[in-house]
Every structure is written in structure tokens, then in C-alpha cells.
Amino acid sequence: MKRLLGECRDRGLCGGGKVSRPPSRLKTDHGAYSVSLPFQRAMNIILKRIRQRLSPQSFPDTAEELAKSDLFAGWWYYSVELLPGLITKGQYPDSFPMLPRILLRNCDLRGTTCLDLGSMEGLMPVVMCRQGAKAVLATDAIDHCRQKMAALRYYYKASFEFQQVGLMYDLSNKLRNPGRGSFDIINVSGLLYHVFSPLMVLAGLRPLLKRNGLMIVSTNVVVDDSFTMQFNNAGSLQEEVNTFWYLSVRALDYVLRYLKLAPIDCLYISHRDIKSSVRYVTDVESGYLSVVCRAKDDPIASREDTWMLKSAQHSWEYAGLVDWDSCNQQAVTHVPYSATIEKNLLRDDTGTVDLLRALSRRTIHQAERSSDAHVLRLADIS
């Protein structure tokens, strides 16, 4: 109630910082009495919000009703079939493969607890539910897809929670819940290039993953031999205003191993293969890389790297920004991953996938079917 009153005050519907008291008695021409208009508006908003929150949402059950609805006609991130043959218009062409979705099929989700970051309308949470997850938590910075997410729950008969997290930092504290516990699988895809500090986001997520759990990390990358992050100065990489950094492939590989995440599989699409109205191609060779990682108990340094382990032992940032005590106390999970990758793509010293070497062999040029794309259909099971 306090929050609703605050909203009314912010909208200028309540006077003097408080709900307006009705004047003593204002006679009308009919001898009746009325209250002040701002007070009436405030109370109407409060009552409407209370009814909305106490009453389950209803959605069109016929194609005719749905086709005429604001729900169907509104802006959608994903293309979603809500009723047979009625698919919302998403932001991506059907040829654009959704790499983390494809990789998720190799994970045995039965009985698992899953976390999805930046869920939008909830395509990945629905897929996780349909693959047998016991519990799924969807998240986003703001609650901007509440109605559409509720629609997916309704039409797909999916049961998952949602939590608004604000800026994607300090997630271990924001999402820690004794009743829910930690996660067997975490999907953090399409996020790291949207934040000021990709390492801070991963540092906040790492304590939420069970020992031996799986994390899918997907982000835009620069393809070269450097260990760098390239800044989106003047929109040179993308014109989108919340895009800041592209990690180099080698930098991403290193950061994951530094945070005790072993790359075990990956898929890649070059930005040159993406047919979209959004400009992805620049004079920098770049693309979108999705990596499946297995949580380990120690940093994974290459044979010649003496710095990584020293840094992990003595760095204040490493010790202070990642709750390693929580990581070490996590239960051990045994989520199977069914895909195998060619041995020549593995580093001989770490046993992990060499991401730069793997790009050419693990490239997808386009989606072969809608279930590989940013499209969700009622018949999809993954």
C-alpha cells in the first residue's frame, strides 16, 4: 500500500505529500456530497492496482480475440506462438540462431534448479521448464515484460518465478535465497556487453552456481589473438546505447578459467552471417560466442601461466568481489552434458576447450529450424 501511495504522490495525485483529505462537505446541486478530485483519482488508482495484484490475469482463448488484443500487437523481443498459428513479431529474423538454446539441449535438466539472466518475455525459462527443470528463476533489470511473461506461463503451462534485480551487480546477494538454494545451471547470455563491468557480473554470479554445475556464458566477442576488451566508442561496434564492451575471445577464455569455470563446449556465429536491420558488421572481425562451462574448485591456469594462481591467492579484488567461501560450501551437482567436442580443440595442459581454436569448427551460419532460432512455438520441447 505504501508503494502505491508513493506512486500516486509521484503522479501529483496527492497533495502536500499526503493523500488529500476530503473537504468538510461540498454540496452539489442535488444536495449530495463529494470529495476532492485528486483524492478520488488516488483512491481509484490504489483500488485498481490492488485488484490487479489480487486477481489472476486473464488472456484471450480464441484466435480472434488474441489477434485484436494489445498483448499480441505490442512490442516483443522474441517471436512467440501464443495460440496455434498466431506468432508475435519478435526482433530477430528466423534465420538468426539462438546459440545458448541449442547448447542447453545437451544439458540434462531433469530435477535441476535453473537461473536465467535477462529473461525478457521468458523463452529460456519456458524451455528450461519443458526440459524437466524442477525450479526456474527468471530475472531482468526491470519488470518490463510482466504481462508477456505471464502470458507465456499461461499459454505454455509453465511454472517459473521472476525476480527484478536492477543493475546486474552483486547478484549473489540479490538472488541468494535459503529456501531456494543455489543453482545447477545458470544461463548468462546476451548480457556481458550491456554492462560497465563484465567481470563484476560474473563475480556476482559465481557463488550462486553449485560445485560441478554448468554455466552458459554468451556474448559478443572480437576475434583476434589479443587479451583485451574493446569499447564501443561512438557506437563503433553497435549503435545500441546500452552496449559497452566486446571481449576478445582469448580474454573471455582466460576470465572464465580464472573464475574456476572450465569451457567444455561452444558455438559461434560471425556477425557477417547475421541478417538483421541492426548493424553488427564493422571493420573489426566480431561475432557472438556461446560457451558451456563446468564449475571447478580451482582456477584453471595454462602450463606457462604462473600469474593466475598467484593472483587467485593474493588479489584483494579476487578475494573480496567473489564469495569463494560460499562457492566452496555449495553442494556438488551432477548435471550430465551429453555433447562431446573434438579432442584437437582441447588444450593439452588444461583439458578445456581452446575457444579461439574452436571457432572455425563450432560455427553455425544460420538456424536450420525455428526451434534453433529466437522463436518459441507451442510444440517446442527445447
Please tell me what each predicted stretch does.
Residues 199-214:
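A short glycine-rich, Lys/Arg-flanked "PGG" loop and its adjoining helix->strand segment in the class I
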Residues 91-110:
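Conserved alpha-helix/loop element of class I SAM-dependent methyltransferases that forms part
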